C-alpha cells in the first residue's frame, strides 16, 4: 500500500492546521508521503507525485486534478479531493473508474467551535463583558456602582453593572429559543440546557431525538418560538430556502429586551428589521456574522452599548482544523496491523 498526501497553499489559506494533523494521523498507521507545494506551484496531481500508478490511497488538499490524473492513478483504491470549491467532475470520473471517493458528509467538524462561540456571545451579551472590558481602559466610571439618590428598586447597585433594559444576568432560567437542531444548534442547546436555560427549538427537518439529546423542547411553530424568547438564536445554514426565513414580522414579535445571537449566517433574518430594533434599543445583539462583511467602520452597529460584535471567526479554531482532518481519516478503510 502506498499512501500520499498533497497540500496546496490555497487550501492552507482556509485550513492552516488540517494538513499536518492528517499527516500525523496517517503516520500512526504506517508510511506516508507528504508533499507540500510552494506558492505558485500549480502542478497537477499526476505531475507532482512520482510514479502515480503505484499510489493506492491519496488525499489531495487543494492540489489541482485533471482527467489525465484519473488515468495516471491506475492503482488507486481511495481518494479524497479537497479544496475551497470542490472538484465534482474529477471526483465523479474517479468514482466511475471504481475508486472510492471520500469527502465530508457534513460540516460537523466545526460544530463544537461555533457552538462554544455562540455560548460565549450569549454570555457576553447578557453581562456586557466586552463593553465593560473596553470602557475601563479609559474611564473609571464603570467602577462607580453608586445607586441613584434615593436608591431605585431594580436600578444600579453595588457591583450590579448589567443593563436592565435588556435581558441580562445568568443564562440559567432564560428562555433560549433556537431555530435549527443541527451540528451547531444542538450543541449550543445542550450547553445552555446544562447551565439551566429553558431551551426550545424549531427545525422541521430534524428528528425527535435531535431535540431530546440536546435538552430542548421541540417547537412546531416559529411564531410561538419567537414570542417567548429571552434569547433568540437562528442557527441554520444560508440557502435559497432559508434566506429571510426570519421575517420582519417574526423579528418584530421578539419581546422587548430580547438578546439576538447570530453565529452562522445573518441573512437568514430580515436584517433591516434586526437593525431597526437594535438601533431603537428594543433588542440587544451578539453577533459574529452580519448582513455586510466586513462591517464598515462607521456602521451604526459598531460600538453600541447593546451590541457585541466579532469579525466572523467562530468556526476556524485549531480544533476545527484537526477535526476536519480526523473525519476524513475515519472514512478511509482501516489499515491492517
Question: Which residue ranges define each predicted feature?
Answer:
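N-terminal glycine-/charge-rich "phosphate-binding" loop or analogous flexible N-terminal tail
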Residues: 1-57
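C-terminal helix-to-coil terminal segments
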Residues: 2, 7-27, 104-114, 125, ...
